């Protein structure tokens, strides 16, 4: 597991350590300046030879990560979710299992869960980059990004109130 760090990086390292308490081997990629999600992955891509799962740390879900796979010939696979209140317009459409940039209908929101091929980052010389704008969108335009819609439990935790609301709802179960 690679954890990309900037804000409170030392505290996270001190808390998680090498991961052995959790049955993991954790490596850290420290950013002195924010590189963006794509830049953070690009900065640590040397750790990966095979496709890997990228998961935003501000999400909570019961999505089964074991079910993720990358179709032969594709550079990425994105998990989409129904649009939340803060993104009613959605991000992208899904057409025949591919991320569709042309369609204006039935757009969904990118969950922050994906499986990525290291090849997605091969041609890049960028240092600061966004995963969507600089890597996934150009690949999707070439038909190289598949996707799926997940309609199960999913929360994007953008604020302390979001975390408190989730904690309260989980306490009720």
Regions found by a protein language model. Name each.
Residues 5, 32-33, 105:
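Structured beta->alpha junctions
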Residues 8, 16, 35-39, 111, ...:
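Short glycine-rich loop/turn motifs that provide flexible caps or phosphate-binding loops at active sites
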Residues 9-13, 133:
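Short, surface-exposed alpha-helical segments at coil->helix boundaries
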Residues 60, 65-70, 83-86, 98-173:
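Catalytic-core segments of class I nucleotidyltransferases/pyrophosphorylases
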């Amino acid at each position: 597991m690679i954890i990309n760090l900037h804000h409170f990086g030392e505290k996270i390292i001190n808390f998680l350590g090498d991961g052995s308490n959790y049955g993991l081997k954790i490596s850290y990629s420290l950013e002195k300046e924010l590189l963006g999600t794509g830049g953070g992955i690009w900065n640590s891509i040397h750790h990966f030879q095979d496709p890997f799962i990228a998961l935003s740390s501000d999400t909570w879900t019961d999505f089964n990560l074991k079910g993720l796979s990358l179709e032969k010939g594709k550079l990425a696979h994105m998990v989409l979710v129904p649009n939340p209140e803060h993104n009613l317009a959605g991000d992208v459409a899904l057409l025949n299992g591919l991320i569709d940039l042309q369609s204006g209908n039935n757009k969904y929101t990118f969950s922050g869960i994906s499986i990525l091929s290291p090849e997605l980052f091969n041609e890049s010389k960028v240092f600061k980059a966004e995963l969507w704008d600089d890597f996934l969108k150009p690949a999707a335009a070439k038909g190289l990004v598949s996707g799926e819609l997940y309609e199960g439990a999913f929360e994007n935790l953008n604020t302390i109130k979001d975390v408190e609301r989730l904690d309260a709802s989980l306490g009720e179960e």
